[in-house]
Every structure is written in C-alpha cells, then in structure tokens.
C-alpha cells in the first residue's frame, strides 16, 4: 500500500451501512474495497485457506523426484490446480456448514486469499517441505523456526472436529501430517506422487 500497488480487500459487517461507511473512508484508486454482511463466511474463509494453501504447496514437494527439475517445476502446477479445485469445494462445504455463504468462498476472502497464500505464503512454503518428506516438527525447526505457520496450527486444532462434522478429506490429510511423512499419507489416501487421483 505504501507504494500504491493495486490491491483489493473485503470488509465484512452485519450492518451493511457500517461496511459502506468504512468502504468510503479507506477506498482509493489503488485500494479497492468490497463489502459484505457475511461475517462468518469471511472469517472462516480467511482462516481455513491457510490449511489448504499448505496442502497445495505440498504438490511441489511431492513432484516425482525422478523427473527432470524443469519438468517438476512445470507440471506440479497441474497438480496444484487439481488441489485448488478440491480445496474450494471443501471450503464451500465448510463455510456453509457454519453459517456462511458459498459466494464468499469464491470472492477475495476465499479464492483470492488462497491464491495469494499459495503463490508466496508461509503456509505453502511449509507444505513444500512436507511434500519433500520432512515431518512438520522437523521442517519447523530446520527452516521456519521463528515463523508462524497458521495453517498447521489450525489443522492440528480443528482436524478431529472437521473429521467428525464434515469428513473434509484434505483438512484431515493435512492434520495427519503432524506426525507422519507426507508421502506416506499420500499412499494411505490412495494418492500418487502428483495427486492425479484427486
């Protein structure tokens, strides 16, 4: 924002007039603000996207190590696209279950935030290490010791409840990674090295 790079945000308030007031105060030519009264949808979307961005990041780490590096770097994107599709589907189910609106997931708080996190976030970086075969605790100690990884912490906290309430496979898979190798998890879930079966 300091450099006036174009970006957008979403303001959630049950009182839509209040949201409009805030929108008028902070919107600029380069800072666009959308508004919604779907507070739970925005809150849940922005939180759980961290879990999914971690799992999508694992796609790069899980690329077939026997393939040439240039092939790994190019084609894990197809794997990521498949995981993004599955992630958004689960996010819709999750958000609607807890009182949010599906359209919120397809907006800035869901799909938009997920995209940013996957492209350059801390959670996707942790996912890459998990995909390479590191356990979470080892990757945290070796590479991200002083960095907060919200997706991992949230997955550990809500994983069991999600399994009970929704059977959301990707969240549960991510939660299991805490004590197991990602490649082992992939095999248990009948997923091959590039998640093609997803």
What are these regions (language model features)?
Residues 1-2, 45, 118:
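Short glycine-biased active-site loop of nucleotidyltransferases that positions the nucleotide triphosphate
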Residues 36-38, 108, 173-175:
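Conserved beta-strand termini and adjacent loop/short-helix elements that scaffold enzyme active sites
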Residues 1-4, 108:
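Short, flexible turn/loop "capping" segments at secondary-structure junctions
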Residues 27, 110, 174-178:
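Short amphipathic alpha-helical surface patches that mediate protein-protein
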Residues 5-104:
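Internal alpha-helical scaffold of NAD(P)-dependent oxidoreductase catalytic cores
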Residues 120-198:
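C-terminal active-site/capping subdomain that shapes the small-molecule cofactor and substrate pocket
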């Amino acid at each position: 924002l300091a450099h006036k790079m174009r970006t957008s945000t979403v303001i959630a308030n049950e009182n839509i007039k209040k949201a409009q007031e805030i929108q008028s105060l902070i919107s600029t030519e380069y800072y666009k603000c959308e508004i919604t009264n779907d507070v739970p949808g925005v809150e849940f979307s922005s939180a759980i996207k961290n879990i999914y961005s971690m799992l999508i990041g694992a796609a790069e780490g899980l690329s077939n190590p026997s393939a040439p590096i240039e092939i790994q770097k190019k084609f894990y994107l197809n794997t990521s696209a498949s995981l993004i599709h599955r992630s958004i589907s689960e996010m819709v189910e999750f958000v609607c279950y807890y009182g949010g609106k599906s359209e919120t997931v397809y907006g800035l708080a869901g799909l938009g935030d997920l995209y940013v996190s996957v492209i350059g976030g801390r959670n996707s970086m942790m996912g890459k290490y998990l995909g390479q075969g590191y356990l979470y605790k080892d990757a945290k100690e070796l590479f991200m010791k002083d960095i907060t990884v919200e997706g991992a912490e949230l997955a550990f906290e809500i994983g069991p409840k999600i399994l009970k309430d929704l059977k959301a496979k990707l969240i549960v898979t991510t939660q299991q990674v805490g004590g197991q190798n990602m490649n082992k998890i992939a095999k248990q879930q009948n997923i091959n090295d590039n998640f093609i079966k997803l």
